[in-house]
Amino acid sequence: VELGYAEADMGLGMGLKTTVEALPAPGALQDIQAAIDHVHTTCGGKVGIVGYCWGGLLTWRSACLLNGLSAAAPYYGGGMTTEAESARQAKVPVMAHFAEEDKWISMDSVSAFKAAHPTSQIFTYAAHHGFNCNHRGAWEAQSAALAKERTLAFFKANLG
């Protein structure tokens, strides 16, 4: 499925997310685990994961539930700061990025998430949800550049 950022595409994407989230466990995580296993089998070495929006939520869940990862970097993970997700504990180092002006993820929930995960690196940016995507109106170049710089340094430190 290839979707853009027009309102109709966003609506279709949300519908697909709802459908996939309704699958019985492990749902999409089994595909992520297969990808991790494939990288280990074919390349060896350490594996990191990064995801944006719903992919950020899946990145968080992967850090908590899957095997074979060495680092995770979720960006504005939609649903990641709920009580249920905050109760999970990561198995690997996590660096998370959130937008201070996100209409879907409140700063109160980010603060609670940060308090629940004191060893995780949590950064916020004066931007909107989707600030890292230069195909969206929410793109914010300075925040995106800083988040990228931090993420690359984080992966270098944890993946080598």
Q: Where in this protein do the model-derived segments appear?
A:
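N-terminal cap/leader regions of alpha/beta-hydrolase-fold enzymes
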Residues: V1-G160
